[in-house]
Amino acid sequence: AASDVYKRQELTVRGTTFRHPKGVLHLTQFTQVALAVVAYAQTERLRAENTLAPTSYFAGHSLGEYTALASLANIFDLEGVIDIVYSRGSAMGSLVPRDEKGNSEYAMAALRPNMAGIDADNVDAWVAEVAETTGEFLEIVNYNIRGQQYSVAGTKKGLKALVDKANAIAPRAAVMVPGIDVPFHSRVLREGVPAFAEKLDELLPQELDLDALVGRYIPNLVARPFELTQDFVDAVAPLAPSGKLDGLRVEDLSEHALARLLLIELLSWQFASPVRWIETQELLFGKVEQIIEVGLASSPTLTNLAERSLAVAGIPEGTIRVLNVERDQEQVMLADVSEAPAPDPVAEPVAEEAPQADEAPAEAAP
């Protein structure tokens, strides 16, 4: 039965045994592949319906960055997406120690600072104080809604202290996120960056579609449009401390070689660095009229984040249209657009005397 497969706690594939107390399908490398394939298929449908704007901005939240690059910048084909996402998930999972039953010491919590009276500018300091007081690892890994929603990875002990402290101020100011036992996007995973960078180097084509990347792609790591400029290289370098960008001058490499190096650095350090979605959204809000989320209608996460963030920013409702590709497919596919009615018959136009030279039409007036 399907439920038996879903709950299966141990699976051996090609000599490797996978274990998870809630079922192996909860393991990162399997859940992320499933999500990536769905997103890839949804984007390909948009392409088939000719609804992808060739100059639109694109960004992906965490895992979504890979499918966005694959579908909108032609970086990977479907097989490549599956390979890289599986490798990414495996790298994350392998860096987390587990007991004989497959349990890890890590978890994740959602923090709502506004409910606990924590100012948006003080959220990082507040979390750091809890970590210092308890001696436990805690790190904000998803910056989702300014002042209202942040994901915090950490040890179970550290997160319990954080949740207890926040909820002592206001009930449900912090809640544990079920089903997560890997500290995604945290410094705990930095040990796996070099191996993942090698995998990216293996799978990335030597020449990239630069028109699809430059000025359009907004990486999680820096939350600003991708560029082949010295300023962009200098902005990425301290966030991707492999040393590969240190002292690099853009004129030393061809555009394709530079783009490829930057992409490897951006993506390999992405899984061990926070997702800067607040800044990404605020950038988009100042540049676009419509946002389309590629994702499931049953869980329109980014649609909800965008709508709430627009309200926080004080942007009037309706100024920017926010759609989910599955939930709002008629609007996304333009299927809700009615044909224009046939024009009423009109009389033949009557020629009028042209204006004299000293009677220029208003459009030509200075």
Predicted feature locations:
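Short alpha-helical patches at coil-to-helix transitions and adjacent helical residues
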Residues: 32-40, 65, 104, 108
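Acyltransferase/transacylase module recognition
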Residues: 3-55, 187, 198-349
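Alpha/beta catalytic cores of group-transfer enzymes, especially the acyltransferase/condensing modules
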Residues: 71-245, 255
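Long, low-complexity, intrinsically disordered segments
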Residues: 352-366
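Short, intrinsically disordered, charge-balanced linker/junction segments flanking boundaries
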Residues: 1-2, 6, 363-365
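Gly/Ser/Thr-rich loops at beta-strand to alpha-helix junctions
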Residues: 65, 156-157, 182-185, 296-302
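Gly/Ala-rich beta-loop-alpha elbow adjacent to hydrolase catalytic centers
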Residues: 60, 64
